[in-house]
Amino acid sequence: MQFSESWLRTFANPEKISTDALSHSLTMAGLEVEEVGPVAPPFDKIVVAHVLSTERHPNADRLNVCQVDAGTGETLQIVCGAPNVKPGIKVPCALVGAVLPPAEAEGKPFEIKVGKLRGVESYGMLCSARELKLSEDHGGLLVLPEDAPVGQNIREYLDLDDQVFIIKLTPNKADCLSIHGVAREVSALTGATLTLPDMKPVAVTIDDKLPVKVSAPDLCGRFSGRVIRGVNARAATPAWMVQRLERSGQRSISAMVDISNYVMLELGRPSHVFDLDKIHGGLDVRWGRKGEQIKLLNGNTIEVDEQVGVIADDKEIESLAGIMGGDSTAVTLDTTNIYLEAAFWWPSAIQGRARRYNFSTDAAHRFERGVDYATTVEHIERITALILEICGGQAGPVDDHIVNLPQRRPVSLRLARAERVLGIELSSAVVADVFQRLQLPFTRSQGADGEVFEVTPPSYRFDIEIEEDLIEEVARIYGFERIAARPPVAESEMRPTNEGRRSTHVVRHALAARDYQEVINFAFVEEKWERDFAANDNPIRLLNPIASQLAVMRSSLIGGLLDKVRYNLNRKAARVRLFEVGRVFHRDADVKDGGLTVAGYHQPMMAAGIAYGPAFEEQWGITTRNVDFFDVKGDVETLFYPRVARFEPVEHPALHPGRAARMLIDGKPVGVVGEMHPRWLQEYELTQAPVLFELELDALREAGLPTYAEISKFPAAVRDLAVVVKQSVRVQDMLDSMRAALDKQGCGRFCQSLVLFDEFRPKAASAAIGADEKSLAFRVTLQDTGSTLQDETVDSAVRCMVDALGEAFQARLRG
């Protein structure tokens, strides 16, 4: 929001407050002033001058010798090359000794001296707006109004000591997107009187009305308009209006457009002016229809659909509702009859529509945040008065259609609650004074916690919905600087920590220690990733995605990790190991609204990792090989230590059907680990298969308490057991069977380890092993802490394992 200080002070003028103090007050009230600067650079000795006569330079075709009255008591001869110089005009004149601003940013100031131009003496310089750094217009001299007083300092005449404010507004402060809105804040902060422009109804001199129908009350809540005939569109915009527009960052276009823009900046009301003679029949405010097109004022031709609001006549669309008018009914210099429109558009109906077509407008910026719905008629009267004053014409009656206005429900503020939130003592009188200064209507009552204020938000305040909004208003006007800085006071309470539960930070460090690097991805992903890696055909969609590719919430971390692997591979990284800790999102009807939950959605934290390329950094002591399933399985087992994970085959849409496993801790599934499915290697252009895992973070954090075991001083008995079984038999099932047999035999406490150390699959059948069989070799280590194990005990333990394998899997000892 950009505006001049002088314009603001016509609405609210705190006389004893300087520019710097005013800027500071606005910033501390939440209206951050990004920049304050003069409208013109410093210069002096430039005055209003009257060109008395001109004649051609005797030695140059493009120069004129001018006789100028600059109020010095004598006529000055000045040589000028401007194309628009002529007798009778008034222009800025730099006298001898004046110093003009540098022509370029890094240049030096330019001093005016008595000089000769092609042999003719010149005693000054007639100036353009560009030479004074007032604008970029270089079409000729800056022509001043005829009533400009000759000899007056141009800084004083044009108010060039005025300051331009640039305010950075937060999205909730749509009520301050106008001079009126900022002035309301200044009045509340300083006590200055708020003065508004005259918005009295103009005299109605014709009875003409344009038929209007509002077919979409969920798009437009109020539509006001009026016919004005006989306007002069070629009328010049007054200098004072042009000046205020330019100092607000707006370029003067034509009187009709300038008036509309002026009132938008003044009162915050975007409006639109139609050429009445180009409208076919009446207007219909409705949602668009698929396939309809409109050429906009910016020259773009766009196609609308049922999600975009439009204003249409009996033949075609004439305006994109609340965003931009159409080219077909645009006013021109030949326009004589107009239809003036001001409406209340529902913010939800405007939000995101302009961005959809890759442009933005001041109107859309305001309407999508909320514009006052109670003052459309008053603002039309203001615009009409300016049009009649500048362009002339005859005004018809205002046609006001009220169809669906917001219902303002009172918002309660508990005085005790405000004191707790702000940490200060507040009297009832202070809060009441704040609301009165902000023009917020309220009533008082007594509640269980003390006094309660019931505030009804005004029609221009769309940011007041809950109690905290009112507390913020109290804090802003009371003054953040008046709130003393005090350290928080809390009871010191010793709470036991759960030694068996690790923090997320520890889990991250453990992953980093396994040579994985952390990445942080967006929680919204491509819909294709959800289908490919999670078999999710109904993902949670975003209502307003930041990009079309990032349109759904992720239910798995795998897609984001794979994308980052490809990103690194494209930058010539040969070995990539990444992990991420973050939330995923699932539909779950059992989840209710809570402090950290949203009804219908389960949001668990997950930890996932991916490894691609060589298992180790290249070095002379290790043979280079690619990472495999067992490398990553070992990493995962390390993360869960000292808890022991059990693995079982799993089918997962992202993983290889024969090289993937589900992890179980205490019989509960906690995640998956495996090699990427071959079909994704080709589709995502990978030359080898990455290995990845995805685990529940809560399970990783449950480390369990460490248990201490006595170290035996007696020798261990080690036995190797080679058995032949069918190739379909799973090793994990055999290990479980042997451990169960040892426990049943009473030898389970002696078993220090039981591992598979060899596997043999014959290429052809033999007498020892059939074609559909395999040989597995297990090593069991038995050791007691109280005594040396006798051979009978060891043999009995081995025998019970062999018997168990034979009974469960028809295993036989290998000969």
From Swiss-Prot:
tRNA-binding domain segment(s): 40-155
EC top class named in words: ligase
Chief place of localization: cytoplasm
Family matches, as CDD domains: PheRS_beta_core (cd00769), tRNA_bind_bactPheRS (cd02796)
Domain B5: start-end pairs: 406-485
Key word 4Fe-4S present: no
Example GO biological process: phenylalanyl-tRNA aminoacylation
Positions bound to Mg(2+): 463, 469, 472-473
Cystine connections: none
PROSITE patterns: B5 (PS51483), FDX_ACB (PS51447), TRBD (PS50886)
SUPFAM superfamilies associated with the record: Anticodon-binding domain of PheRS, Class II aaRS and biotin synthetases, Nucleic acid-binding proteins, PheT/TilS domain, Putative DNA-binding domain
SMART domains: B3_4, B5, FDX-ACB
Reactions this protein catalyses: tRNA(Phe) + L-phenylalanine + ATP = L-phenylalanyl-tRNA(Phe) + AMP + diphosphate + H(+)
InterPro entries assigned to the protein according to its UniProt record, in alphabetical order: aa-tRNA-synth_II/BPL/LPL (IPR045864), B3/B4_tRNA-bd (IPR005146), DNA-bd_dom_put_sf (IPR009061), Fdx_antiC-bd (IPR005121), Fdx_antiC-bd_sf (IPR036690), NA-bd_OB-fold (IPR012340), Phe-tRNA-ligase_IIc_bsu (IPR045060), Phe-tRNA-ligase_IIc_bsu_bact (IPR004532)
Cofactor names: Mg(2+)
Free-text remark on how the cofactor is bound: Binds 2 magnesium ions per tetramer.
Subunit architecture: Tetramer of two alpha and two beta subunits.
Similarity section: Belongs to the phenylalanyl-tRNA synthetase beta subunit family. Type 1 subfamily.
Protein name per the record: Phenylalanine--tRNA ligase beta subunit
Organism: Cupriavidus pinatubonensis (strain JMP 134 / LMG 1197) (Cupriavidus necator (strain JMP 134))
